[in-house]
Amino acid sequence: MILRLKDQTLIKINSTRSYLSSLVFRRDSHSQARTKPDHDRRRRGYERDVRIEEKKEHDGLFLCKSKGQHLLTNTRILDSIVRSSDIRPTDTVLEIGPGTGNLTMKLLEAAQNVVAVELDKRMVEILRKRVSDHGFADKLTIIQKDVLKTDFPHFDLVVANIPYNISSPLVAKLVYGSNTFRSATLLLQKEFSRRLLANPGDSDFNRLAVNVKLVADVKFVMDVSKREFVPPPKVDSSVIRITPKEIIPDVNVQEWLAFTRTCFGKKNKTLGSMFRQKKKVMELQSLSAGRHGSNVEVMNQTGGDSDSDVEEDGKDDLLCLDTDASMFKERVIEILRTNGFEEKRPSKLSHRELLHLLSLFNQAGIFFHDITSLQMDLHE
C-alpha cells in the first residue's frame, strides 16, 4: 500500500512538472514570436490591400499590392543601397516611387538634392510632411506624375525601389532616354534582375538583356528577402546597378530594336530556320522595299520572346513565293550561310556577332525597322 501511494505521488509530481514546463515553453514561444518583425505578423490573412501603421509618420495607410506599393523597412538594407550608389555631396538623385520616404530620408542625408517622382497623392502628402519635419524640405523636389509619362529634370544618379509592374518600360526609358547620368541603383523583382544580368548562352538570356547591355553595364549588388517589405510581395527582390557605357556602338537604335525583336521572337531557333519562314520573308521584303519608295503593303510584325510555337524549318516555303520574293529569300539565306550564321541561334550570340549580322543585312538592302513607326520597343 505504501509503495502504491509513493508511485501515485511520483506520477502527480511528474505530471505537475510536465504541466509547468509546458507553460514555460509556451510563454517562451510567445515571447519569441513577439520578437519577430512586425511585417511577419501583418502578412497573414491579407490578399491585396494591407493597412499599416508607422507611429511617427501616419496612421491607417492602405497600400495596394496591385500598384506595386511595397515599402522597404529594413534600415540596414536601406543604408547598403545608399552606400552602393556612390552618392557624392554635390549630386542630384532621382528617386522613383518614394512611398512614405524611408529611402528618401537616407538619400537626402547623402545628396545635395533629391527629385522624387510619385503618383499617389497620399504618399506625396506623407512624404512632404516627413521631410519638412526633419528639416530637408529645401532639398526635395516632388513631381506628382506618372513616371512613364514624365520628362525628367537633370539628375546625376537614380536610386529607387521600382514598382514591379513598370520595371521593363522604366529601365528602357532610363537607358535609352535623353538624360545622361552616372548610374542607376535599382531594387527590382529578383527574377527580372536575373533576366537583366543574363549573358549569351544562359537559359534566360533575352531581348531585354541584349538591348540594355548594348548601351549599359549591369552589375549585381545584393538580394533582398520579401520579408523586408510592408506589405511583403510574393517574391524576393534584388538590387542591381546599371552604368551607361561611355562609348556605344554606332547603330541606328530603331533598326537595332526591330532586329532584336525579330531574332529573339524565337530565340532558340536557328537563324536559317527563322528566316526561311514565308511570313518573315514577306515582312522583311516589304520593310526593305519601303526604304526605296515602294508601295508594297507592309505586313503586321510579330513579336514576343517565346519558343512555344511549333518549329518550322520553312524549306518548302520557297515554292509558295513569287519570283521576287524567292530571290529576296535566297539573298537573306546566302548572307547567313556565307558568314556562318545559318545554324546559329540568337540566344547564343554576343553583341559583336549580332551587330555584325545586322550590318551585313543593311549593307545588302535588308531592313527590319518600319520607318512609319515612331514607337521605341525595348522589351518584350
Swiss-Prot record:
It is an enzyme of class 2 (transferase). Pfam families: RrnaAD. It is found in: Mitochondrion. Residues 1-26 form a transit peptide. Disruption phenotype: No visible phenotype when grown under normal conditions or under cold stress, but lack of methylation of the adenosine dinucleotide present in the mitochondrial 18S rRNA. GO terms for molecular function: RNA binding; rRNA (adenine-N6,N6-)-dimethyltransferase activity. Its main location: mitochondrion. It catalyses: adenosine(1914)/adenosine(1915) in 18S rRNA + 4 S-adenosyl-L-methionine = N(6)-dimethyladenosine(1914)/N(6)-dimethyladenosine(1915) in 18S rRNA + 4 S-adenosyl-L-homocysteine + 4 H(+). One of its GO terms (cellular component) is mitochondrion. S-adenosyl-L-methionine binds at residues 70, 72, 97, 118, 146, 161. The keyword Transcription regulation does not apply. SUPFAM superfamilies: S-adenosyl-L-methionine-dependent methyltransferases. Its EC number is 2.1.1.-. InterPro entries: KsgA/Erm, rRNA_Ade_Mease_Trfase_CS, rRNA_Ade_methylase_Trfase_N, rRNA_adenine_dimethylase, SAM-dependent_MTases_sf. Keywords: Methyltransferase, Mitochondrion, RNA-binding, rRNA processing, S-adenosyl-L-methionine, Transferase, Transit peptide. Gene3D superfamilies: 1.10.8.480, Vaccinia Virus protein VP39. N6-adenine methyltransferase which modifies the AA dinucleotide at the plant mitochondrial 18S rRNA nucleotides A1914 and A1915. Not active as mitochondrial transcription factor. Belongs to the class I-like SAM-binding methyltransferase superfamily. rRNA adenine N(6)-methyltransferase family. This is Ribosomal RNA small subunit methyltransferase, mitochondrial. It comes from Arabidopsis thaliana.
